[in-house]
Swiss-Prot record:
Residues 1-16 have a biased composition (Basic residues). Residues 1-27, 87-189 are annotated as: Disordered. A motif (Nuclear export signal) lies at residues 82-93. GO terms for biological process: mRNA transport. The modification Phosphothreonine is found at residue 174. Phosphorylated. This is Protein Rex. It comes from Human T-cell leukemia virus 1 (isolate Caribbea HS-35 subtype A). Rex escorts unspliced gag-pro-pol and singly spliced env mRNAs out of the nucleus of infected cells. These mRNAs carry a recognition sequence called Rex responsive element (RxRE or XRE) located at the 3' region of the long terminal repeat (LTR). This function is essential since most HTLV proteins are translated from unspliced or partially spliced pre-mRNAs that cannot exit the nucleus by the pathway used by fully processed cellular mRNAs. Rex itself is translated from a fully spliced mRNA that probably readily exits the nucleus. Residues 143-164 have a biased composition (Polar residues). Residues 105-114 have a biased composition (Low complexity).
Amino acid sequence: MPKTRRRPRRSQRKRPPTPWPTSQGLDRVFFSDTQSTCLETVYKATGAPSLGDYVRPAYIVTPYWPPVQSIRSPGTPSMDALSAQLYSSLSLDSPPSPPREPLRPLRSLPRQSLIQPPTFHPPSSRPCANTPPSEMDTWNPPLGSTSQPCLFQTPDSGPKTCTPSGEAPLSACTSTSFPPPSPGPSCPM
């Protein structure tokens, strides 16, 4: 009995490798996804009793793939029609012309905004030119309130919350590293 079990193993080692992946639990391989040309049993992968059942890999013909027209359902268009429709929708003549008209004023607007800031920055930077940005910045409250001006220190000395006499601390007087919001245009730092 052990001799008969060893003979198929020796014959499997002499066989050429199979062109498809084999597993121990796989008994037969079927080409079930193709049409009737390859629906027959190709090879018994494990434990073939003799070489007579083995089909040589050279004998296996490549499967016959059906033409594209037979796979396509009757309602769907062909690939040529789909590609022509896609090409017509992506053509370079008609679609870019409507966006070009609104883009021309949009392209000129950033140019005007880039030209305008140098005319507005010098008046707003004149009060900040007297004191360097590393020194203490002074913020004056609006004219309606009678509280004292808040002094803001640099970020090196830490945040400072000013509390005028007899008043609760204001949220606008708390600063960490940013200058307070001013009603006018901000100074460039």
